[in-house]
Amino acid sequence: MNDFTKNIAQALFNQDKINDLLRKELQQAVNDLLEAELTAFLGYNPYARDGWNTGNSRNGAYFRKVDTQFGKIEIQVPRDRNGLFHQHTLPDYKQHSDVLENMIIKLYSKGVTTREIADLIEKMYGSHYSPAQVSNISKQMIPKVEAYHKRKLSDKFFCVYLDATYVPLRRETFEREAVYIAIGIKPNGHKEVIDYCIAPNENIEVWTELLQSMKSRGLEQVELFLSDGVVGMKTALAKTYPQAHFQRCLVHVMRNICAKVRVEDREAIMNEFKQIHQQANKAAAVDVLHAFYAKWDKSYNHVIRNLKDIEPDLLVFYNYPKQIRASIYSTNMIESFNNVIKRKVKPKAEFPTEQSLDTFIGIQAMSYQ
């Protein structure tokens, strides 16, 4: 009679003891099977000399609790150094895996690196994911992002903000590339990222393609576009949305002015220029703007001359109700979204491919409210 048989015999009159005994035996058996599985995968026993210099080795284990009819058992799932071993003794715990994979995608969208996610998941849940596995899980979002780029758009938006931000991307060499972004507000006040695209730098040809794509997907009518001073934007808008009005971002205009004047004049110029968007009506704003011309023309003739050239685009927001003017004289709304992207991108240092960047931005865009 072996030890197991003796223990069973002693426990026969106590159901709890039998369950506890069977639970312990099952736990040991499963752990032995898992270790045998890894040995077969590696091709050598623990500490064996024939395992030297094979390119792979044992790398500890992670713990997993499994429900059985005899109670919970604690399993030590062995790991290999290269992260290639996948055990077949235990079935995948699908519900738990789904929770973890959703957590991985959420952490990825927050800008946490794949290595940090792998470490965090193991510490929190005792489940081992290599950085490569984390990256593969995040790739599950690729079809959703592709569908997002192709989705049917609403036919009307009251206002559309256009702006580009720069994100580090590797294409053989490391460069900062432009992410073109369009955020819209519908007549009911709902906000959404309409679409975005990635290109090496900002130019009007890419903006034109993005605008044409938006129209081809159903966006027929826009009341107002807001953008900075990228050359050719008004022309591109006139071709695609000829009925739309255009407001140049006053914050960008002010920054450009301050970059072209003396340091000692910047504070006064900035404070006076801000008065333009704080008036009760358009007529009062025109008076303030013309007073600004008169005061600074002698010192900065080239700046004032350029400002006069774009005057028709500076005060368009006054044509709309006072309650919404604060939201439509600048592209601050889209810049807030850009800042979120930059903050989340920072820990990643750079994106290895355009697709990885597209997926990351897509997750941000789809969760934008």
UniProtKB/Swiss-Prot annotation:
Tree of life domain: Bacteria
DNA-binding listed as a keyword: yes
Family matches, as Pfam families: Transposase_mut
PROSITE patterns the UniProt entry points to: TRANSPOSASE_MUTATOR (PS01007)
GO molecular function ontology, one term from the record: DNA binding
InterPro entries per UniProt: Transposase_mutator
Single Gene Ontology BP annotation: DNA transposition
Record key words, sorted: DNA recombination, DNA-binding, Transposable element, Transposition
Purpose: Required for the transposition of the insertion element.
Family, similarity comment: Belongs to the transposase mutator family.
Name of the molecule in the record: Transposase for insertion sequence element IS1201
Source organism: Lactobacillus helveticus
